Amino acid sequence: MNCPDCGDEQTRVIDTETSADGTSVRRRRECQRCSFRFTTYERPEWDSLQVKKRNGTIEPFNRTKLRAGIERAVEKRDVSETTVTTLVDDIESALQDRETRLVSSSLIGELVSDRLRDLDKVAYIRFVSVYKAFSEPQEFLRELDAVLNAEIDDFEAPNDSQ
């Protein structure tokens, strides 16, 4: 650590304290050349998430891009900005909780589609039609059929609480 006063590289730590919440370390240092005392703080730097795209390229995780994709899917639907923000936070948190810093774009797509399926069926269909890159109307109809059949099953499920 260089002295901020004279620039010399020879400094020594004279005191170290960990913050109450354990997220940082405060160190008092003294320059060996000019005796100037100064304080430094150490905090962990989180490795940023990296996304591996279908074509094999890797790019930094982009929260704005995630939000834009969700906003396109929920456009003109009764979904509030707060709900979208919560959805984005939830997905980003799920990605940060993973042990690896490299996640696939398909994993992100699955997380989004799972949450949209529970939130708004129309938004879900919009999202998966782009995410799964439907090229034929039959693919779209199969997905729509699956959503409708799941909805019918939910509606017809017996109520065990009676």
Curated annotation (Swiss-Prot):
Single Gene Ontology BP annotation: negative regulation of DNA-templated transcription
Annotated region (Disordered), positions in chain: 1-21
Zinc fingers typed unnamed, residue spans: 3-34
GO molecular function, one term: zinc ion binding
Keywords: ATP-binding, DNA-binding, Metal-binding, Nucleotide-binding, Repressor, Transcription, Transcription regulation, Zinc, Zinc-finger
Residue ranges annotated for the ATP-cone domain, each copy included: 49-139
Cysteines paired by S-S bonds: none
Cofactor note: Binds 1 zinc ion.
Cofactor (UniProt): Zn(2+)
Function description: Negatively regulates transcription of bacterial ribonucleotide reductase nrd genes and operons by binding to NrdR-boxes.
Membership in a protein family: Belongs to the NrdR family.
Name of the featured protein: Transcriptional repressor NrdR
Gene name of the record: nrdR
